[in-house]
């Protein structure tokens, strides 16, 4: 099983909006099902820092990069608008650069 992790900013003043979305996502079985359909187990962490807030996303599965690409391609328009407003992520601009594994204590 492979894993991929990435970090995205929560733009200034948008943390409460993000928290509200997370509350909705937790109640929506279709959201989790979309991740299963993409072949990944997604986890989302909130990282609060003195320099701003971030989310850390992990995708675990046979091919997390392909799963992430599928999630991006099938993102509902309202969620795409949310990602743009809260994270500055334009899902129509193509995928962001994929993260590079810098250290693995078991490798």
Which residues does each predicted region cover?
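Short, extreme N-terminal segment that most often corresponds to the first beta-strand
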Residues: 1-14, 18-21
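Short, well-ordered beta-strand segments in beta-rich or mixed alpha/beta enzyme
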Residues: 4-9, 42-73
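Short amphipathic alpha-helical segments
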Residues: 14-40
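Generic alpha-helix signal with a bias toward terminal, lower-confidence helices
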Residues: 18-22, 27, 47, 56-58, ...
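An amphipathic, aromatic/His-enriched active-site/gating alpha helix that lines ligand/cofactor pockets
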Residues: 30-41, 60-97
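A conserved mid-domain beta-alpha-beta active-site/ligand-binding segment of alpha/beta enzyme cores
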Residues: 99-104
């Amino acid at each position: 099983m492979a894993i991929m992790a990435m970090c995205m900013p929560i733009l200034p003043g948008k943390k409460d909006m993000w928290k509200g979305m997370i509350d909705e996502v937790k109640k929506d079985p279709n959201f989790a099902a979309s991740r299963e359909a993409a072949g990944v187990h997604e986890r989302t962490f909130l990282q609060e820092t003195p320099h701003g807030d971030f989310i850390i996303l992990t995708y675990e599965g046979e091919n997390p990069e392909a799963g992430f690409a599928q999630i991006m391609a099938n993102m509902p328009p309202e969620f795409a608008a949310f990602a743009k407003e809260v994270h500055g992520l334009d899902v129509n601009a193509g995928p962001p650069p994929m993260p590079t594994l810098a250290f693995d204590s078991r490798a």
